[in-house]
Design a protein with these regions (language model features):
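Pre-Walker A (pre-P-loop) alpha-helix and adjacent loop at the N terminus of AAA/AAA+ ATPase modules
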Residues: 3-47
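Canonical AAA+ ATPase core
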Residues: 85-89, 107-115, 123-198, 203
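Walker B catalytic acidic pair
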Residues: 43, 106-107, 118
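P-loop (Walker A) phosphate-binding loop of NTP-binding proteins
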Residues: 44, 78, 146
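Conserved beta-strand position immediately N-terminal to the Walker
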Residues: 39, 103, 141
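Walker A/P-loop
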Residues: 33-70
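Conserved alpha-helical scaffold flanking the Walker A/P-loop in AAA+ ATPase domains
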Residues: 28-31, 84-105
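Short beta-strand-centered segment that lines the nucleotide-binding/catalytic pocket of NTP-utilizing
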Residues: 42, 63-75, 131-139
Length: 203
């Protein structure tokens, strides 16, 4: 609708106040949110991928979490687990970082297949089962998984069947010379002055 279009324009305006360039990437992120999909992003570190998603989360007053995928990561580190409380003698459920609106899975191909599968299951089911209890992730829910196309040593490539779980694959390139000049000019902590464009319920 026209109102929805105006709201998205407000979101774009606010994010672009902070993130210079990467318009193609930002637009794909918004498409994924509205279509309830997820993104697989390829690009070297330092291209504002984290900043873009974090800024977008702040713009809609959503929650944002980042997980650095490593070879020693466990599925429980993502989804959560049951913890024993010595003081009370009871078990309680501790939910993992997937319970957020915007999740950045940084270098997903650095974690073993069982961890990748745990994340992909949450992406598809939008819920987690811990000790027989189901817990739904919040809405909106967007997973942006990144891969570094240059450093592949010691990685666990995603099988094609798992790559298909993502709505789209986005290649993030370097900014232009003009954009780099603007970036240098604007390194003044502008993120502190952001305005809310809409909230989770409106989205």
């Amino acid at each position: 609708s026209r109102n929805a279009g105006a709201l998205m324009q407000n979101v774009l305006y606010e994010v672009k106040r902070i993130v210079v360039g990467q318009d193609h990437f930002l637009e794909r992120v918004l498409v994924a949110i509205l279509a309830q999909g997820h993104l697989l992003v390829e690009g070297v570190p330092g291209l504002a991928k984290t900043l873009t998603v974090n800024t977008l989360a702040k713009t809609i007053r959503g929650s944002f979490k980042r997980i650095q995928f490593t070879p020693d990561l466990l599925p429980a580190d993502l989804i959560g687990t049951r913890m024993y409380n010595q003081r009370t003698g009871d078990f309680s459920t501790v939910l993992g970082p997937v319970f957020t609106n915007f999740l950045l899975a940084d270098e997903i191909n650095r974690a073993p297949a069982k961890v990748q599968s745990a994340l992909l299951e949450v992406m598809q089911e939008r819920q987690v089962t811990i000790a027989g209890e189901s817990h739904r992730v919040p809405e909106p829910f967007l997973v942006m998984a990144t891969q570094n196309p240059i450093e592949t040593e010691g990685t666990y490539p995603l099988p094609e069947a798992q790559v298909d779980r993502f709505m789209m694959k986005v290649l993030v390139g370097y900014p232009t010379a003009t954009e780099e000049f603007v970036i240098v000019e604007s390194m003044t902590g502008a993120i502190q002055g952001m305005q809310k464009a809409l909230n989770n319920e409106e989205l």
